[in-house]
C-alpha cells in the first residue's frame, strides 16, 4: 500500500472530523481503546492541532475490559490531555450482569448498548464518532459514513442517505442523532500501516507474548483476572498469542502468533484471509447478530 493512499485516507478522515465539528452542536468520539480508536484519536489530535480536540472521548466501560486496556486508556488521557468521559451502566452492575452469568448477548445489550444509549442521552450528544470500518463485518460494509439513528438510537438501513462527492447530509430531525465513521474506507492493513508510519501507541495486547489462555468454544480465551471460572476439562495453557481485536476479555479470542512488532504484524497479515471480528463472540450470538445489535443502538 502506497504512502499516497494512506495520506488520502488520512485527509478523508480529517475532513469528516472537521465536518462533524462544523455541523453538530455537541459531538463525541466513542473511544473503545482498540487500534482503530487509537488511530481515530491520533487523527483527532492532528485535525485540530495545536488546539485540543473540541469534543470529549467517551469510553463505555462494561467492567470486563482487559486490565491492560484500562491502564492504557488512563495513560493516554493523562499524556495527551484529552477530555475523557467514562460511563458504566450502574443498573447492570447492581443486577450482577456479566458474560459468564448471563451470556454474551444479554451482557452486550445491557453493558454496552444500553450503557451507550444512557451516556448519549445524559450528555445530550447529537453526533457520535467511532472507528468502525467497512471491511470488518457485513452489516458495517453497507453502512454510510454518516449514519442517521432514530430517537431510540436505532439504525434502519433503508433510511441511509446517498453520499456522493464527499457531500454529506448532516441534518437530523427532533430526537435523532448521527453516528459517524471516519475510518469507513480503511482496511485492517491500512490501520497497521498507519500505526507504523505515525508511530501510534497501542495496547500491548496486540503484540505476541506468553499469556495464560484456555480453549473454549473454539477460541483461545485469556484468563485476565480471578472472575473467570475454569470449567471441568479445561486447562490453563501458557501460549504465545496476540489479539487482532479487543473487547470484553471473556468474549475475545486470541490467536497463536509470534508477531511482536508492528512490522511483524504486517507480514503476518499478508497470509490472513479472515476478518478480525471472527474472534469476537458477540458477532456470532445468532445469524445477523451485528446488524440486530446496530438496530438496537449498538456502535
Curated annotation (Swiss-Prot):
Alphabetical keyword list: ATP-binding, Nodulation, Nucleotide-binding, Nucleotidyltransferase, Transferase
Highest taxon in the source lineage: Bacteria
DNA damage recorded as keyword: no
Catalytic activity line of the entry: sulfate + ATP + H(+) = adenosine 5'-phosphosulfate + diphosphate
Record's keyword annotation contains Cell cycle: no
Biological processes annotated in GO: hydrogen sulfide biosynthetic process; sulfate assimilation
GO MF, any single term: ATP binding
E.C. no: 2.7.7.4
SUPFAM superfamilies recorded: Adenine nucleotide alpha hydrolases-like
Classification via PANTHER family: SULFATE ADENYLYLTRANSFERASE SUBUNIT 2
Assembly notes: Sulfate-activating enzymes, NodP and NodQ, may be physically associated.
Family: Belongs to the PAPS reductase family. CysD subfamily.
Purpose: Proposed to provide activated sulfate for transfer to nod factor.
Name of the molecule in the record: Sulfate adenylyltransferase subunit 2
Lineage start: Bacteria, Pseudomonadati, Pseudomonadota, Alphaproteobacteria, Hyphomicrobiales
